């Protein structure tokens, strides 16, 4: 039996087309149109940043060294892995290209200082993993620090940070790799759930494309609902250390 990963509305439209039933979609309200327009703006902002991060990856020896020690060049390109450099490079690039800074702020890519209102990049010195929703739209990023340096207070930056929550990205409703995994997972009726983005990509490179990861938190009910839409069997794979085993138990 063939499975399709469709939303309810998409499923109704698909069945209507199959059996010649006319599907009358109601006119959207002004509020719905405004929300749809905002979502499209955020998708475009993420696409703009993703292209920049990919270009910067090709210019960074440190980013390439880190990534190539873990994955092949083909896998790096397939997953759109990029690099966010220092010195507010994305902000400067956006100004040079006359991109909409407000959209980049709304997308969580540019931050505004609460002290003096100056703008700065949300991701600095990080390998960038694009995050897609179930239909393939780019909704955010997860950034992995590659050369951690302690701040003035002696603390190292977080190993991973994700895009802050936006109208198109909710951490507790998103699984990294879900878009890439859903068709193969549905066909195999099996989904691997691992701890982090590198684990997803590593397993996908050895024919385990049916692999996802939560966004740094324990699995939520909405993430579990996503899993149940496509499979009935799940394998939980933790890192081979006490913290990893505990994380999987929490999940």
Regions found by a protein language model. Give the residues of each.
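Phosphate/diphosphate-binding loops
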Residues: 240-250
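Phosphate-handling DNA/RNA-contact segment within nucleic-acid enzymes
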Residues: 31-37, 44-46, 87-234, 247-248
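Short beta-alpha connecting loops at secondary-structure transitions
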Residues: 235-239
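Non-catalytic accessory segments of DNA primases and related replication-initiation nucleases
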Residues: 1-107, 111, 126, 138, ...
């Amino acid at each position: 039996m063939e499975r399709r990963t469709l939303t309810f509305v998409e499923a109704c439209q698909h069945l209507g087309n199959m059996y010649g039933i006319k599907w009358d979609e109601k006119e959207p309200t002004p509020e719905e149109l405004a929300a749809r327009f905002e979502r499209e703006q955020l998708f475009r902002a993420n696409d703009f940043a993703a292209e920049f991060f990919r270009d910067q990856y090709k210019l960074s020896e440190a980013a390439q060294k880190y990534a190539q020690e873990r994955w092949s060049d083909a896998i790096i390109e397939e997953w759109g892995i990029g690099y966010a450099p220092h010195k507010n490079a994305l902000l400067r690039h956006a100004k040079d290209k006359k991109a909409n800074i407000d959209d980049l702020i709304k997308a969580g890519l540019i931050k505004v200082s609460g002290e003096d209102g100056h703008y700065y990049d949300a991701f600095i010195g990080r390998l960038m993993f694009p995050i897609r929703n179930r239909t393939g739209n780019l909704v955010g990023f997860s950034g992995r620090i590659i050369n951690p340096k302690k701040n003035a207070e002696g603390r190292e930056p977080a190993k991973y940070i994700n895009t802050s929550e936006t109208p198109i990205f909710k951490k507790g409703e998103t699984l990294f790799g879900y878009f890439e995994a859903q068709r193969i997972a549905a066909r195999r009726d099996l989904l691997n759930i691992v701890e982090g983005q590198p684990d997803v990509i590593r397993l996908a490179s050895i024919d385990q494309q049916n692999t996802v990861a939560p966004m740094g938190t324990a699995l939520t009910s909405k993430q579990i609902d996503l899993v149940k839409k496509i499979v009935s069997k799940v394998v939980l794979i933790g890192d081979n250390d006490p913290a990893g085993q505990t994380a999987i138990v929490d999940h």
